[in-house]
Amino acid sequence: QTIKFPLTFKKSQYSNSEKANWSEKKLADSGYGQGDILVNPIHMASIYSAFANNGSMVKPYIEYENGKTEILKQDVFTAETANTIKNDLIQVVENPEGTANDMKVPGVTIAGKTGTAELKNSSTDTQSGTLGWFDCFTVNYSNGNDMLIIGMVENTQNNSSGGSHYVIKKIKSLFVK
């Protein structure tokens, strides 16, 4: 779906070709972010907003001050499914074994997901970089002023702790002074 937004960004896609050719391998690869699916950060924010809002996607906006929240698409997930995903995403941060446990902030409930996307042109490509992602949102934060934050940084292939952990440090600094 096209999202009207005051900034220009690349369109999200399901496939590198006009007609998706979904082999079992390509479907599995896409499930963990290594297939043809490409999602821009604005679209990713809208998807995550559905987990925070009982299944409804919020229309993205830039908040200069007192932004107005509008629903982009109602009930893209059932409230039950959205809450299950939200609780799982909270465990990614809260559980000591979670991939984003470094994001845990005392007194703040944060739901999040780490990710690293490879930019390889082929299975033998060793020169292309990676993208480190961290997508998160607060739950019942600061008098109902919840935040959804999408962070992505390029060329994280030399980060020994994974690309998303660089992003986590930056986002956590918004909560810890």
Predicted regions and their residues:
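A short acidic/glycine-rich loop-to-helix N-cap element
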Residues: V153-K169
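Membrane-interface anchoring segments and C-terminal beta-barrel signals
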Residues: F134-V139, Q157, K170-V176
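Beta-lactam-recognizing serine transpeptidase/beta-lactamase-like catalytic domain environment
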Residues: Q1-V153
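Short, gly/Ser/Thr-rich active-site loops of penicillin-recognizing serine hydrolases
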Residues: K68-K73, H165-K177
